[in-house]
Amino acid sequence: MDFRIGQGYDVHQLVPGRPLIIGGVTIPYERGLLGHSDADVLLHAITDALFGAAALGDIGRHFSDTDAAFKGADSRVLLRECAARVKAAGFTIQNVDSTVIAQAPKLAPHIDGMRANIAADLGLPLERVNVKAKTNEKLGYLGRGDGIEAQAAALLVK
């Protein structure tokens, strides 16, 4: 068996006038994440972890932020396409563990929905998908509420 571990990271700036979408869940908040697509920081980190584990590059290689085709793209669609490409390369996704770092809003009420979306998009049982939420203890740009960051790890097997 060939086991592969991938690590993913993403960060986006919080700005007025955009919806806040994390893990495919629209979260009520006065600001949203700035980006070419829907800027779903969590799904972007997971997508990078999956592509990385399969040695298929990163999200930008597959879904460029300079390509008009991905303007406003739903990151759940991108995650499903990523999973299809990883599977086409001969891998099976085993699990995903992730962390979202945001000073605000509180994400705990939305974690179950995020996990359900990710599990559905990757074709995994819910118990193989984890999402954690942390603050940055008011330190740095995250602590000031200027942005939201996500980190993810994924295990693949061939």
Swiss-Prot record:
Pfam family, one: YgbB
Chain positions recorded as 4-CDP-2-C-methyl-D-erythritol 2-phosphate binding sites: 10-12, 36-37, 58-60, 63-67, 144
Site (Transition state stabilizer): 36, 135
Gene Ontology molecular function, alphabetical: 2-C-methyl-D-erythritol 2,4-cyclodiphosphate synthase activity; metal ion binding
Pathway assigned in UniProt: Isoprenoid biosynthesis; isopentenyl diphosphate biosynthesis via DXP pathway; isopentenyl diphosphate from 1-deoxy-D-xylulose 5-phosphate: step 4/6
Superkingdom of this protein's organism: Bacteria
Entry note: cofactor: Binds 1 divalent metal cation per subunit.
EC number annotated for this UniProt entry: 4.6.1.12
SUPFAM superfamilies with a match to the protein in the record: IpsF-like (SSF69765)
Residues that coordinate or bind a divalent metal cation: 10, 12, 44
Cofactor requirements of the protein: a divalent metal cation
UniProt entry keywords in alphabetical sequence: Isoprene biosynthesis, Lyase, Metal-binding
UniProt xrefs under InterPro entries: MECDP_synthase, MECDP_synthase_CS, MECDP_synthase_sf
Catalyzed reactions per annotation: 4-CDP-2-C-methyl-D-erythritol 2-phosphate = 2-C-methyl-D-erythritol 2,4-cyclic diphosphate + CMP
Any GO BP: isopentenyl diphosphate biosynthetic process, methylerythritol 4-phosphate pathway
Subunit structure: Homotrimer.
Similarity remark: Belongs to the IspF family.
Function noted in UniProt: Involved in the biosynthesis of isopentenyl diphosphate (IPP) and dimethylallyl diphosphate (DMAPP), two major building blocks of isoprenoid compounds. Catalyzes the conversion of 4-diphosphocytidyl-2-C-methyl-D-erythritol 2-phosphate (CDP-ME2P) to 2-C-methyl-D-erythritol 2,4-cyclodiphosphate (ME-CPP) with a corresponding release of cytidine 5-monophosphate (CMP).
Name used for this protein in its record: 2-C-methyl-D-erythritol 2,4-cyclodiphosphate synthase
Gene: ispF
